[in-house]
């Protein structure tokens, strides 16, 4: 039987690893980002029956969202270098009854398919690429003529402050920024989407930006910040960054929530920048 997909593996550049805690963090983050990614997909013109490729699919959140939008007559392929995280994605799709998703262990640059896709999408992908222009070209070759290429990226260096000022929130956010500055391959990816698309020989992308904001006790931002710092702890250790004698990870999510609510503060997550182009 002829294989529908061909792939070779190469070394991963994902900075956060795929520990059980990190996979759980990805799932929580996926729920928080879902409305923004859905707006991107709808702006692109996602429709029933489409064939979609999800780059660096991780735990499968974007793949499952796309599968819901294209319906059972469509098809989704999610690729990732980590078989461990793909096993999680496969189980989640099975539990959700989304049988029109296929997950393939593959690197983006080596992946190929017998038929092109109506849409190729990636979320938080370009920030991990040392050669983002090459990745865009590789992704574009998988899109059918008239199809679309779309990316949802995070502006990592964006202000994630609190107003009024909450020292614990701001200190945690600064630690995360410091860790990412030394670990991400393409820290300014969200600021350079027009440049990257242009250098790849692609049409100028359509763009929009949204920012996550919270302040109430039920905001998902507390858990997101605490879990992200936990995943980055090995990187902080390698950088020999010591948070300080008074800083501890124990109960950080609850302490962030208590501090923000007590101060009646408004907290900000990083800007989410989305770009897409029809090819």
Language-model-detected regions and their locations in the chain:
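Class I SAM-dependent methyltransferase SAM/SAH-binding core
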Residues: 53-55, 59-110
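Conserved alpha-helix/loop element of class I SAM-dependent methyltransferases that forms part
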Residues: 31-51, 65
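A short SAM/SAH-binding and catalytic strip from SAM-dependent methyltransferases
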Residues: 118-133
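N-terminal, positively charged/glycine-rich alpha-helical extensions of SAM-dependent methyltransferases
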Residues: 1-23, 27-28
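A short glycine-rich, Lys/Arg-flanked "PGG" loop and its adjoining helix->strand segment in the class I
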Residues: 133-148
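Conserved catalytic/acceptor-binding region of the Class I
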Residues: 150-219, 238
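C-terminal helical/coil "lid" or tail adjacent to the Rossmann-like core of SAM-dependent
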Residues: 15, 21-22, 206-267
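A short acidic, Gly/Pro-enriched loop at the edge of an enzyme's catalytic core
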Residues: 111-119
């Amino acid at each position: 039987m002829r294989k529908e997909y061909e792939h070779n593996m190469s070394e991963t550049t994902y900075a956060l690893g795929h520990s059980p805690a990190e996979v759980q963090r990805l799932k929580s983050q996926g729920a928080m980002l879902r409305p923004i990614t859905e707006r991107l997909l709808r702006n692109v013109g996602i429709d029933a029956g489409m064939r979609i490729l999800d780059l660096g699919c991780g735990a499968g959140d974007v793949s499952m969202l796309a599968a819901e939008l294209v319906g059972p007559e469509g098809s989704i392929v999610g690729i990732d270098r980590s078989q461990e995280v793909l096993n999680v994605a496969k189980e989640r799709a099975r539990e959700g009854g989304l049988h029109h998703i296929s997950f393939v262990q593959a690197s983006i640059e080596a992946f190929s398919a017998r038929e092109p896709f109506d849409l190729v999408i990636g979320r938080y992908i370009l920030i991990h690429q040392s050669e983002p222009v090459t990745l865009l070209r590789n992704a574009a070759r998988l899109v059918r003529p008239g199809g679309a290429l779309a990316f949802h990226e995070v502006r990592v260096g964006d202000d994630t402050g609190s107003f009024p000022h909450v020292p614990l929130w701001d200190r945690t956010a600064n630690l995360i920024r410091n860790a990412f500055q030394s670990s991400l391959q393409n820290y300014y990816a969200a600021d350079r989407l027009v440049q990257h698309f242009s250098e790849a020989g692609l049409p100028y992308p359509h763009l929009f930006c949204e920012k996550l904001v919270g302040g109430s006790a039920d905001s998902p931002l507390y858990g997101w910040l605490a879990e992200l710092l936990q995943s980055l702890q090995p990187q902080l250790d390698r950088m020999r960054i010591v948070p300080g004698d008074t800083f501890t990870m124990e109960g950080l999510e609850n302490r962030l929530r208590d501090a923000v609510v007590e101060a009646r503060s408004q907290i900000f997550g990083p800007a989410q920048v989305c770009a897409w182009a029809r090819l």
